[in-house]
Amino acid sequence: ELKAQASRFLKAFLDVDIAPQGCIPTVGSMQGSFTTFLLCSQLDPAKRKILFIDPGFPVQRSQVRILGIPSESFDIYDYRDEKLGPKIESFLAAGDVAAIVYSNPNNPAWICLTEDELRTIGELATRYDAIVIEDLAYLCMDFRKPLGRPFEAPYQTSVARYTKNYILLVSGSKIFSYAGQRIAVAAISDTLFRREYPALRRRYNIGRLGDAYVLVFLYAASSGTSHSAQHALAAMFRAAADGELDFVGEASEYARRARLTKKTFLRHGFRIVYDKDRGEQVSDGFFYTVGYGAMTSAELLSELLLYGVCAISLTSTGSRQHGIRVCVSQMNRPEQFEMLEERLRVFAENHK
């Protein structure tokens, strides 16, 4: 049931056709990325590297280090639009990149890759036979656009329109704020699911990618995902595709919190680090990035902690810019906004 509803959900909100067979439940997107990194690194002995388009989710960088998988990365800050293709190709041309990883919308910057940029990524992935791991944890959460209407344009942008070499990670904890149960779906394209890899057959006696992913990698990692969480996610997928659950409307509360807190940071001398999408102001959402004066990421993080403001350093996300990632998910009481205002006011007074 979950596989069927996941397939329908992806059609409803991405306008992408993926057979139920390829929609595979995982114990959260964390397990999805962990196992797909390992899978991709074993498809071709000549291709083991993971290419991260940064900034990104820090734990994914930790995952490849834990697994002993080599990686490369670059900060997208200076490589938007027509600059993106040549930069990615400079890595792929070496012939050792197994997979390209990014999130869209982006964690932590909340920038959103455009159709043209995704077309570029997809075409290069096809040309160099690399797999794109597209993390859609924040699917349809570019709140500048009227996304989230099932089976109606505009749809969430996705590399799935431009290559057959893709795996989509869809997170129940983010899309539906269903965090406690750890449930997600790794959606593998039909072509990639059926593809035979000699290296997999030699190593596991299972050559088809989709079969190997389920019967080797996921089985060894956890033996499966809890049935109760699968039933819950299936019900939410069904309700969303039926138009009964407005998950985008529910999540727009995070955009409201981001707008309010951004104004507070800006009022006290901070700046938005990743502030533009092709000349347009970046969307509001779960996360955004701020910097202050000439402070490095570590300096700003350490100083803000002294004033009772917690965040993570942009350095941990692979960013080459200086600043911190702000998360608004726990800003759920009116008095917290007043506390932030007062703490940043004192911070600014002490850092003139």
Descriptions of predicted regions:
Residues I131, I167, F287, G323-R325:
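Structural preference for beta-strand elements that scaffold enzyme active sites
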Residues G56, H227-Q230, A234, F247-L266, ...:
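Conserved glycine-rich beta-strand-loop-beta hairpin in the small C-terminal domain of fold type I
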Residues A4, R8, A12, V16-I18, ...:
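PLP-dependent enzyme catalytic core of the Aspartate aminotransferase-like
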Residues A187, T289-G291, C327-S329:
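Short hydrophobic/aromatic beta-strand micro-patches
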